[in-house]
Design a protein with these regions (language model features):
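Basic, polyanion-binding surface patches
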Residues: 1-139
Length: 139
């Protein structure tokens, strides 16, 4: 209907937020959370999404998302003369599921295949990770 989405309304400057990276198997749930609800209704409650506290962070993260960026809102900008907004956040902390972390040569590595992030391409199109490959960096 052209009105500002609740997400943008809730993300005032200085607010805390969590950016979750969903696993490809969560595509139905991600799509379900896009349903239009009255402002006082939460998509978390409407979809029975389990939440987990994270150390001393003021917000809870989604329990079964493999990656969560714990952020503070820097600014929100309206794009052109449209009702589209972009929100800039500062990532202050990162959660990665232990099942997606490996150690190699003394370095912590995130296993991209274990995360298998859901990519939203636009409209109703999504993608999975596809092929994962390694390229040596120049010296």
């Amino acid at each position: 209907d052209g009105s500002t989405k609740d997400t943008v309304t809730n993300l005032s400057e200085g607010a805390y937020c969590i950016v979750h990276i969903a696993h490809v198997s969560q595509s139905d749930l991600v799509t379900a959370t896009a349903a239009t609800l009255d402002y006082e209704h939460s998509e978390v409650s409407a979809n029975n999404i389990a939440l987990t506290p994270h150390s001393d962070w003021p917000l809870q993260r989604i329990s079964n998302c493999p990656i969560a960026y714990l952020c503070k809102v820097h600014s929100t900008t309206t794009i052109g003369n449209t009702d589209q907004n972009i929100v800039f956040v500062e990532a202050l902390e990162l959660y990665v599921d232990d099942k997606a972390v490996t150690q190699h040569n003394g370095r912590v590595q995130v296993d991209a295949k274990a995360v298998n992030p859901l990519a939203r391409l636009g409209a109703s199109q999504y993608a999975d990770l596809g092929n994962v490959f390694t390229k040596a960096r120049p010296k």
